[in-house]
Amino acid sequence: MKPVKILWHKLTPNATIPTKRAEDAGFDIYTTESDVLLQPHEKHLFKTGLAYWIDKEHWLMGVDRGSTGSRGLHIHCGICDQGYRGEIFICICNDNDFPVHFSSSAADRKSVV
């Protein structure tokens, strides 16, 4: 199996290129937003400031990280098709009965190729 080629493009200066260690299942994708308060059972589309290009016959799928569920948060799974060239968003839902504050651009989404 040949390696998948993926190119990241910053749409905003404060965007962070996703990171991936060799042993990771996918990329950690970071938001460009901070100081967001999610009320109980509220969801928010977090901006990433990123677009991407990927080899044909591949796509990105956003899924929960292992630690996300333990904090009462849920990433609404989404697929970014190979031909999509717009900004990637992270939809996070607060499943808790209390507000959750996002103070920095944490890596809250795992993206699997």
Whereabouts are the PLM-identified features?
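DUTPase catalytic domain/fold
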Residues: 1-113
